[in-house]
Amino acid sequence: MMKTLSSGNCTLNVPAKNSYRMVVLGASRVGKSSIVSRFLNGRFEDQYTPTIEDFHRKVYNIHGDMYQLDILDTSGNHPFPAMRRLSILTGDVFILVFSLDSRESFDEVKRLQKQILEVKSCLKNKTKEAAELPMVICGNKNDHSELCRQVPAMEAELLVSGDENCAYFEVSAKKNTNVNEMFYVLFSMAKLPHEMSPALHHKISVQYGDAFHPRPFCMRRTKVAGAYGMVSPFARRPSVNSDLKYIKAKVLREGQARERDKCSIQ
């Protein structure tokens, strides 16, 4: 199955097996959108704008292979529990963000981690131990004074101890401290190309008038020694029906992969 990303002189088709979704969760005002902004365009926005739910898409050409990463920047208020559950079900990699100067936001991350494990276990034959979920616990605002800290590093690290698919980072979206390193480790845990990390690929900008004719991106579709990334300018959140189909297809692919593994072992 192939996903068509744009039309015109150049059509970008991404194999379904190379399409992933990153879900960013956490309480309000902890810096989720700032971290996403750093990931997408390397910028930090000083002005706070409450997020209801933002959807972004980044397309990569990595040594000639096409990849797609959808980014779901969720609301900290979670007014619609059913939508929160659907967002978790569709997620492949997760970033749980709290503020180092807010104990309440850390408690919310602990609740979210538990909810993710419970929800995703439904896709793994209801066995939590079978769920391998690449996840980063992210303590943001480490540029603030230690006097403001309400969450000790050792306490936060307990959330990831003993889980090779979970890591803890203290970052500053404002100062861009440890942000690139965090994404590198997250993609490594998910067995995704390292070049998907912000610092490891060339960024291609698409102007408004060129959005449906991304010729510079197409010119790099051959097998070349390089990695390129482009933020889709007109990304739209898929419908609920599309998300449900996505979940079904993903479960089917994972089941087929497990069967192949069993056959190879036997």
From Swiss-Prot:
**Membrane topology classification:** Lipid-anchor
Q: Which InterPro entries match?
A: P-loop_NTPase, Small_GTP-bd, Small_GTPase, Small_GTPase_RasD
**What tissue expression does the UniProt record report for this protein?**
Prominently expressed in the striatum, weakly in the cerebral cortex and the CA fields of the hippocampus. Highly expressed in the hippocampus and cerebellum, only during the postnatal period. Also expressed in pancreatic endocrine cells (islets of Langerhans), adrenal gland and stomach and in a thyroid cell line.
> Which residues are reported to carry the modification Cysteine methyl ester?
263
The terms describing its cellular component in GO are: plasma membrane; synapse
Keywords, comma-separated and alphabetical: Cell membrane, GTP-binding, Lipoprotein, Membrane, Methylation, Nucleotide-binding, Prenylation
Q: Where is this motif: Effector region?
A: 48-56
Residues reported in the UniProt entry to bind GTP: 26-33, 73-77, 140-143
Q: How is it modified after translation?
A: Farnesylated. Farnesylation is required for membrane targeting.
**Interaction with GNB1, GNB2 and GNB3: region residues:** 189-235
Prosegment location in residue numbers: 264-266
A molecular function (GO) term:
GTP binding
SMART domains, A to Z: RAB, RAN, RAS, RHO
Q: A GO term (biological process) for this protein?
A: locomotory behavior
Instruction: Name the principal localization, coarsely classed.
Output: membrane
Tell me if Nucleotide-binding is a UniProt keyword of this record: yes
Enumerate the subcellular locations listed in this protein's record, separating them with semicolons. Answer: Cell membrane
Q: What induces it?
A: By thyroid hormone, efaroxan and glibenclamide.
Q: Where is the lipid attached (S-farnesyl cysteine)?
A: 263
Give the UniProt family note. Belongs to the small GTPase superfamily. RasD family.
Q: How does it assemble?
A: Monomer (Potential). Interacts with GNB1, GNB2 and GNB3. Interacts with PIK3CA and UBE2I.
Chain's role: GTPase signaling protein that binds to and hydrolyzes GTP. Regulates signaling pathways involving G-proteins-coupled receptor and heterotrimeric proteins such as GNB1, GNB2 and GNB3. May be involved in selected striatal competencies, mainly locomotor activity and motor coordination.
Q: What is this protein called?
A: GTP-binding protein Rhes
Question: What is the species of this protein?
Answer: Rattus norvegicus (Rat)
